[in-house]
C-alpha cells in the first residue's frame, strides 16, 4: 500500500476543521448511472432552470466550455475553444501529466471528506488551458445531486 493510501485510511473518521460533524454512514456512495448527453439542451427543463439559478446556462452561450455531473456520473464535458481541455477526472487520470497535480494541494488526510474523495472517487473535473491558449469566455461547471442522501465524492483540478 502506498503512503498516500495509508494517510487516507487513517483519516477516514477525522472530523473537518469547520462545520458540523456529519456522519458519512447516513449517505450512500453508490449512485445510479446516467447516460451522457450530446448537449445540455437535452436536460429536463426543471434541471436547466435550477442550473441557470446557479449561473450554468444550458445554451452554453458566452461559455468556453462546460462540465456537468449528475450524482456520480459525468454526463457532459465540452470545450469550444482551441487549447482548452475540459475532462472528467477519471478520464484525465489516464494521462501522465495529471498525476503530477493529483492530490498535491489538498492533503488526502485533511479530514474524512478528503479521505473519502480519495478512496472512493466518483468523478470531478480537470480544466486546463494549454500554454498560449487565449480563453476569452468562462468555463462553467455544475455538479449536482439527483438522488437523495448520496455522497458525491469528487476531486477537481484547474
Placement of each model-derived feature along the sequence:
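Glycine-rich and polybasic anion-binding loops at the starts of cofactor/ligand-binding domains
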Residues: 1-158
Amino acid at each position: 500500500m502506498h503512503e498516500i493510501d495509508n494517510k487516507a485510511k487513517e483519516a477516514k473518521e477525522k472530523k473537518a476543521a469547520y462545520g458540523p460533524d456529519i456522519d458519512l454512514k447516513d449517505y450512500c456512495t453508490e449512485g445510479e448511472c446516467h447516460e451522457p448527453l450530446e448537449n445540455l439542451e437535452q436536460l429536463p427543463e426543471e434541471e436547466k432552470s435550477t442550473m441557470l439559478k446557479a449561473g450554468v446556462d444550458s445554451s452554453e452561450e458566452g461559455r468556453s466550455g462546460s462540465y456537468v455531473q449528475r450524482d456520480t456520473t459525468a454526463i457532459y464535458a465540452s470545450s469550444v475553444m482551441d487549447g482548452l481541455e475540459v475532462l472528467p477526472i477519471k478520464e484525465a487520470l489516464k494521462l501522465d501529466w495529471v498525476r503530477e497535480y493529483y492530490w498535491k494541494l489538498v492533503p488526502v488526510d485533511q479530514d474524512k471528506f478528503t479521505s473519502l474523495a480519495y478512496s472512493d472517487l466518483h468523478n470531478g473535473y480537470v480544466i486546463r488551458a494549454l500554454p498560449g491558449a487565449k480563453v476569452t469566455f468562462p468555463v462553467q461547471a455544475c455538479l449536482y445531486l439527483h438522488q437523495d442522501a448520496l455522497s458525491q465524492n469528487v476531486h477537481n483540478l484547474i
